[in-house]
Regions:
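Structural detector for helix-capping/boundary residues
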Residues: 20-23, 141, 174
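Short, charged phosphate-coordinating catalytic segments
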Residues: 7-50, 154-155
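Short, basic (Lys/Arg/His-rich) helix/loop patches that form interaction surfaces
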Residues: 1, 10, 78, 90-111, ...
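Generic structural detector for well-ordered beta-strands
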Residues: 35, 77-79
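Extended hydrophobic-aromatic, low-complexity segments
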Residues: 3, 36, 44-47, 88-89, ...
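C-terminal secondary-structure termini that scaffold catalytic or DNA-interacting sites
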Residues: 40-75, 82-84, 107-108, 166-169, ...
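Short functional hotspots where side chains directly engage DNA or cofactors
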Residues: 31-39, 134, 145, 154-175, ...
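Basic, Lys/Arg- and aromatic-enriched nucleic-acid-binding interface segment
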Residues: 1-14, 18-20, 28-31, 65, ...
């Protein structure tokens, strides 16, 4: 499912994926990607909604609002694979989705809600006999995989849309193999014949 794939391949937040529109799909220097410019958030019905004044917001449906990102860092360009790019456009053309229409909606044509995605995500996990984890863990996976690939910190924060590497590191979980590989690169082999001789001398002196 493309909605799930975007969580892993692009590290996009839930609201950013729900709000994705064709006009956000761009090619820069021949690189396909997503220019993240908006998100969907729950702020309540129009008569009850309390929205920060610095956010541009448009009511979509029920308690759902289309807003600008909460931080400058969240407004970012995230490269995606050619395969994902082509499949997104295939969906757009097949369903006749306009430039400012939502790429993902529920069966009634309304914006996707987290509860709807959570239901389908859990259903997919069960079908694949996988343990229950939240879809938000996909962002942790993206942060961890970019760290494993030794991507520079500034690039990782740019992709994740974080304001600092501290937050990105909070999402990062190093696996044992990558830690071992990094340690092997940093620390040379310290074992040689001299080490054995020195140990014997120290023992005799004592």
């Amino acid at each position: 499912m493309l909605l799930f794939e975007l969580a892993f391949a692009a590290g996009m937040r839930e609201g950013e994926r729900y709000a994705l529109m064709p006009y956000e799909l761009e090619q820069r220097d021949g690189v396909p990607g997503i220019n993240v410019q908006q998100q969907i958030q729950q702020y309540g019905k129009p008569e009850d909604a309390v929205i920060p004044a610095w956010l541009k917001a448009e009511h979509l449906y029920g308690i759902l609002w289309l807003t600008t990102p909460k931080t400058h860092a969240a407004h970012r360009f995230v490269p995606i694979s050619t395969s994902l790019w082509q499949r997104l456009w295939a969906r757009i053309k097949r369903l006749g989705i306009g430039p400012r229409d939502l790429i993902f909606t529920n069966s009634r044509g309304n914006p996707v809600r987290s509860s709807t995605e959570r239901y389908n995500w859990n259903k997919a996990l069960k079908a694949a006999s996988l343990p229950p984890v939240t879809i938000h863990s996909a962002r942790h996976w993206t942060a961890s995989m970019t760290a494993r690939a030794n991507m520079p910190d500034d690039a990782r924060t740019a992709i994740m849309g974080h304001t600092s590497i501290t937050m990105t590191n909070h999402y990062t979980h190093r696996d044992t193999a990558s830690l071992a590989a990094l340690l092997d690169q940093a620390i040379p082999d310290l074992h040689d014949d001299t080490e054995i001789i020195e140990a014997e001398i120290i023992e005799e002196t004592a």
